[in-house]
Amino acid sequence: MTKHFYERNDWLLNHETNKTFEEVQWMTEDEFRQWFIDLRKAVVHSWDTMGQPPRVGWSEDAIKKQFKEMYGFSVHEFEHVDELTGEKDVIRNTSVVGNAANQWFPTMMKTRINYTKNDDGLSIYDHFLKDELLEKTLKYSKRHFKRDSFYAYSNTIKVNEIINVGSYNVKFKNGNDFVRWFEENNIRQYGYDYWVESRDDDEEYSGYNEQLKGAKYLEVTQDILETIPTKSTMNIKSHDQKKYRLRMYKYGQKIFPVGLKAFRVSWCQYAVNFPPLTAKLLYEKFTKHVKNQDRIVVYDPSSGWGGRILGAMASRTSIPLHYVGTDPNTDHTIDGGGGTTSTKYSDLADFYNSAKNEGVLFEQSNTYEIFQLGSEVVRDDSSFQTYKGILDMVFTSPPYFAKEAYSEDPTQSYKKFTGYDAWREGFLRPTLETAVEYLRNDRYLLWNIADAKFGADMLPLEKDSKDILESLGMQFKGVVKMALAQMPGGNRIDPDTGLPKAKNFCKVNGMWLKYEPIFVFYKPEP
């Protein structure tokens, strides 16, 4: 039986280009360049011939185990109070359970991200494939793999931090003493080494982690550099600096899988999935008042990367839940057998239901129906019209106009409508009109969208969505704050206000977090 998902990428992890950190550390400039060229070729080969992008992935058994956890997962523990407002409107989901849904969609990181109106955005895949991007990616890779910018393989050493190596239990007030101890006692015999990192005199931590502010680290001065082996000083940018910081590491650490995140975090933006457990929470929370009917029908106008259909299948509602989704992306079409076609959404849902019911005496599954049409035209489909007036919830994360080029299909909304105004009237408005018309009274519509920078313009996606929905009689009830697991770059604190510089932020358990807004609307009784 054909599998429509990729599994753990053992081919890349076992490939000869998966060097250890010390091997990369000790490479000359030319050696590093050739290693990286070979790595790019290996990644493209894995992606194109085996359908495996540069992500680790889980095995089929691990996916089943993960999916089995979802139905009984206590998702309501994700809800938190925002300490800035006192409202319990923050969802902080740090679990990876359900993330295996990504493995049905290897084209996620082939999605181009547009920053201008020229539709010339690049994807992570482009950065591996295109020769003209070699120098850019080489520069980033030196930073991440040779200089370990994510601190994935080597750590700075704090002043008076206890170091346990072999039979030694020592601490140092300065880096020069550390170097003398390390070299005189041949500490490398215990499988450890260090490298010297250039630091600017005025470099100071400016992030949100209070524990890192004011921390002092072991540093060495110029006069001791000549006593340090060349292999440990290959990353020094300038020998004219007054001080250099020490980074210690253990031998034998492979660059991957840990290093795979570097491609997602730094090269360019990439498409992300909606967290399945967060979707499960929202389905359960906003349909709990639905009673006295045979099933709960939820509608997803942009099925995307499968996160919401998986969350729907895992939802634990008082009555069975039926998911209706639509998406025109033909990349998600698969052979259904017997000359028919199906979708990866169907395959994902069926796989989940099979895993959930495995070994269970009384099987119970939520159901689904998928349409491969744009949400602006799906109302013309006779089968979809059977849902008119019986939807119990509408919930999606729609396209941000042309910000993300999900595929090159002419049916994609950004291809059909080349300008924002035309897209708003030709896609956004009819999509919302259908959603409201087909929604029952006393029901909710959740809209995960945010204003997007596009060239010199800031697209008013939030206001336009709100204006259209309110013109259709929907009542705005507030915002659910979906906290992000990481805050790279955007977590900096404004020294004048003491607040994060991000547009949307909240505070949970004393920690600043960015969030994506999910706008909540209600359709009242007439």
Where are these regions (language model features)?
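Class I S-adenosyl-L-methionine-dependent methyltransferase catalytic core
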Residues: 1-68, 72, 82-128, 132-151, ...
